[in-house]
Each structure stands twice: as structure tokens, then as C-alpha cells.
A protein has these predicted regions:
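Conserved ABC ATPase "signature" region
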Residues: 84-85, 136-156, 209, 265-266
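Short catalytic/signature loops enriched in Gly
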Residues: 3-6, 19-29, 34, 155-156, ...
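A short, proline-enriched helix->beta-strand linker immediately N-terminal to the Walker B motif
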Residues: 180-184
């Protein structure tokens, strides 16, 4: 991490969703309950950096992305973008910032309007934000964005409809549309999870190139640690609304400290077939986010849990240079 202020800084973010009690619950005056989707999360993204937020389905990754993008309101905490806490801004003040914050969605088959040709889909952000300009200016930006997204020659795609494209091509169209506004922050929510394996690497390499060639920061949401290890600068591992480990990507992969991270890595295929790793099968399902377990929220599934883990809720503790993990065993090892 540099001494320069980060492009994006999330501080103690909490996002909850109320649970309806129903008629019986109201009559019995049962207390109101809430889903704790994000529970005290802090992270940062620097310019020119790719940060991967990793975890199982239901851990709160996507809700984190939606809260950062102001698609979902934060319950508490702050999201600092370019020095401003965007959680406090009204729609009018937020609008110009949206130009510099773009999101790529998971499903390329639903993110594009089937009625729009590729040309119209890519130009739409300019129209929405009133930045269309002259026809010649639009064409220059259109061709540039298409080329940067790997859709070359652009003329081959501009008049096609989404149903005439492959999944990888659709995702590249979505990326091209996001580039039309020259964003400084790009949030990629599982950008390749619905694509064929044969085209995933191409899309990820594209994102990596966008990050490395300029000042764009990328927050990539993924459940795939192998993808994160290969492309991200830093990895943040999330479980049940909280960060359980964070650090430089290589360090987290080579020297995982939290039992949950170790379990995720144990099922990642190895390049060297001679490298034998015993998969760690986690027992049970992720607990209900309405009823968070006491103590360490991972203890019901943890293979090394101790009695104290049911009581102590560990904070992130140093596990190496810029490397932290939330586990009492890590705290002990580094005292």
C-alpha cells in the first residue's frame, strides 16, 4: 500500500436487510430481525490496482459491491471515493460520480438490452449522462472503447444484436460500454463465472490490461481463488459478512493463515500434478446471516476450532507484511 490516498476506501461498512415478521410474528410481538449481509467491512483499492474479494456464495460479496455502487443503501459506515463519502450524497450529487464508477455484471446474457444493437448498447452511457457530443466524437470514442475491449475490428460487431454474439463477446460489449465514460473505478462482479472456460482467460486478461495501462482501480468479486491468485494484486477473503483474511495475493495463496482460506485453497487445482493436497471439506452450510454464531462466526465449520472460538470474536491480526487474518491461532503465533 502506498502513502497516497486510495481511490476507494470502505470503512466499517454495514448493510442489513429487515426480515418480515409476518402476521403471527406481529401478533406475538416477536422482535424485528435482519439479514446481516455486510457486517463491519473495511477495504481499499488504489489506482492501478486490482483487488479480489473472494468467498462462497452468500458471504456478502455482491452486496458489498452493490453498496459501494449505491445500488443498495448502507446501514452504517462510509464509502470514500475520491475523498468524498458517497453514502451521504443525494441522487443529484451522486450522478457525476457515477460516471467514474462503473460495474460489470455477472450475467452477460441479461446485462444487455436484446433490442439494442452493439453500437447503441456501447453508446448508451454517453446518452444517459448527457455526454453524447457530436457524431464524429461519438464514433471516435466508440471505436476506441470497442478496440480496448478486444472487439476488433469494431465494424464486425457494431450492427449485431446480443443474440448474435457469444457469451465472451457479450461481456466484452459490456466492458466496452463501461469504458465509454473513462471510469476510475471498475467493479467486476463475477465477470467470468457464466462464461465458457475457453474464453474466461481472455476476459480476465483484458481486465488486467485495463488496470495495468492506466490509473483505473478494479475491485473484482469472485468465488474462484485461482482466478484471484493469478490476476489480483491483493486478495480479501470474506465469510458471512466479514473479512477473515487479507494480504498480497501471492502471500495469501502461498501462506494462508485462516482455516477458511486454507479450505478454499485446498480444492484449487494445482499446475503440478505431483503436488498432492488433501481437500479440506467444510462440514455443514454457511450459517443463517439472520442468526450469526457467537464468537468466531466460522467456528461451527472450522476443522481446528477450540472451545474459546465459541466466545472470542477475533479481529484481524498481523500475519506478515501487509497480511492479516481474523483467528485466535494467528494472534497467538504472532505475539
Amino acid at each position: 500500500m502506498s502513502d497516497v490516498a486510495p481511490l476507494l476506501e470502505v470503512r466499517d461498512l454495514v448493510t442489513t436487510f429487515p426480515v418480515r415478521r409476518g402476521l403471527v410474528g406481529a401478533l406475538l410481538r416477536r422482535p424485528h430481525e435482519a439479514v446481516h449481509a455486510v457486517d463491519g467491512l473495511s477495504l481499499s483499492v488504489d489506482k492501478g490496482e486490482m483487488v479480489a474479494l473472494v468467498g462462497e456464495s452468500g458471504c456478502g460479496k455482491t452486496t458489498t459491491a452493490q453498496t459501494i455502487m449505491r445500488q443498495v443503501d448502507a446501514t452504517s459506515g462510509s464509502v470514500i471515493f475520491e475523498g468524498r463519502d458517497i453514502t451521504t450524497l443525494d441522487a443529484g450529487d451522486m450522478r457525476p460520480l457515477r460516471r467514474r464508477m462503473q460495474i460489470i455484471y455477472q450475467d452477460p446474457y441479461e446485462s444487455l438490452d436484446p433490442r439494442f444493437r452493439v453500437r447503441d448498447a456501447v453508446l448508451e452511457p454517453l446518452v444517459v449522462h448527457g455526454l453524447a457530443g457530436s457524431k464524429s466524437e461519438r464514433e471516435i470514442k466508440l471505436v476506441d472503447a470497442m478496440s480496448r475491449a478486444g472487439l476488433t475490428p469494431p465494424e464486425l460487431y457494431l450492427d449485431r444484436y446480443p443474440h448474435e454474439l457469444s457469451g465472451g463477446q457479450r461481456q466484452r460489449v459490456a466492458i466496452a460500454a463501461s469504458l465509454m465514460l473513462d471510469p476510475e473505478l471498475l467493479v467486476a462482479d463475477e465477470p467470468v463465472s457464466m462464461l465458457d472456460v475457453s474464453v474466461r482467460a481472455g476476459v480476465l486478461t483484458l481486465l488486467d490490461g485495463l488496470r495495468s495501462k492506466g490509473d483505473m482501480g478494479i475491485l473484482m468479486i469472485t468465488h474462484d481463488l485461482s482466478t484471484a491468485a493469478h490476476f489480483a494484486d491483493r486478495i480479501i477473503v470474506m465469510y458471512l459478512g466479514r473479512i477473515v483474511e487479507e494480504g498480497p495475493a501471492r502471500e495469501v495463496v502461498r501462506n494462508p493463515q485462516h482455516p477458511y482460506t486454507r479450505a478454499l485453497l485446498s480444492v484449487v487445482p494445482r499446475r503440478d500434478p505431483r503436488e498432492q493436497v488433501t481437500p479440506q471439506i467444510l462440514v455443514g452450510e454457511t450459517p443463517n446471516p439472520v442468526n450469526i454464531p457467537s464468537g468466531c462466526r466460522f467456528h461451527p465449520r472450522c476443522p481446528v476450532a477450540e472451545d474459546r472460538c465459541r466466545i472470542i470474536d477475533p479481529a484481524l491480526a498481523p500475519a506478515g507484511p501487509n497480511h492479516h487474518a481474523a483467528c485466535v491461532l494467528v494472534e497467538e503465533r504472532n505475539r
